[in-house]
Regions:
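Ser/Thr- and Asn-enriched, surface-exposed coil loops between beta-strands
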Residues: 27-32, 66-71, 165-167
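Recognizes extended acidic, P/S/T-rich segments that occur
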Residues: 47-83
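Residue-level detector of high-confidence beta-strand sites
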Residues: 15, 61-63, 163
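Extracellular Ig-like/FN3 beta-sandwich strand-entry sites
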Residues: 45, 81-87, 146, 182-184
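Short loop/turn motifs at secondary-structure boundaries
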Residues: 37, 111-187
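Pro/Thr/Ser/Gly-rich low-complexity, intrinsically disordered linker/stalk tracts
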Residues: 5-44, 97-127
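Beta-strand-rich modules
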Residues: 1-9, 72-102
Length: 187
């Protein structure tokens, strides 16, 4: 940008390259983030800081120095309280020094906010051993909403022998308090 004052003196603005944060969702419960370096003609970046939205507040999760790789892998396994949605932003702290006009300040530039969605997964056991190692049959949901959850267990005659709408309530291999006969049961 060029501006001219009343004396016909021209002033040119500095060029700036903003931070663009991008990312990929990976199947192994990780989010891969990367961003370009912030650039400003008469400024020097002193650090980059990566923030993650945790409970509605952006919290610092990593700090980088200029010259570091601008890349982060966020392991989100076990963080399913937000149904698989994760939001991030990057801040660049820089010193702006323009001696000709007496400017020497430390400033911050923010990237875009990037939100990534992990896909929901369901893990279902393939066997139950009443009074054994795997004594409760119930699926485990990761990054899924259990609002419409329903599970039914059927015997070999197609009769419902267990039913639950509560994800935390699994089948213990009993019907009316008695352990069922070994065999195949469908769900």
């Amino acid at each position: 940008i060029v501006s001219q004052d009343s004396c016909n003196d021209s002033y040119f603005s500095d060029t700036v390259r903003t931070i663009l944060l991008s990312g990929l969702v990976r199947a192994n419960f990780t989010n891969e983030l990367s961003w370009n370096p912030f650039e400003i003609g008469q400024g020097t970046v002193t650090q980059y800081e990566l923030f993650k939205d945790i409970g509605g507040t952006f919290t610092s999760v990593a700090t980088y120095l200029p010259g570091d790789s601008l890349f982060y892998i966020d392991d989100v396994a076990g963080q399913d309280g937000n149904n698989g949605s994760f939001c991030y932003r990057v801040e660049a702290t820089y010193n702006l020094n323009i001696p000709s006009i007496g400017v020497n300040e430390t400033l911050v530039s923010q990237s875009n906010i990037l939100c990534l969605e992990q896909r929901g997964k369901i893990y279902v056991p393939n066997a139950i051993v009443p009074n054994g190692v795997n004594n409760i049959f119930r699926p485990v949901l990761v990054f899924s909403n259990d609002q419409n959850y329903s599970m039914k267990i059927f015997n070999r005659y197609g009769e419902v022998i267990f039913e639950s709408a509560d994800l935390n309530t699994g089948w213990d291999g009993t019907v009316n308090g008695r352990i069922v006969q070994g065999g195949v049961y469908s769900y």
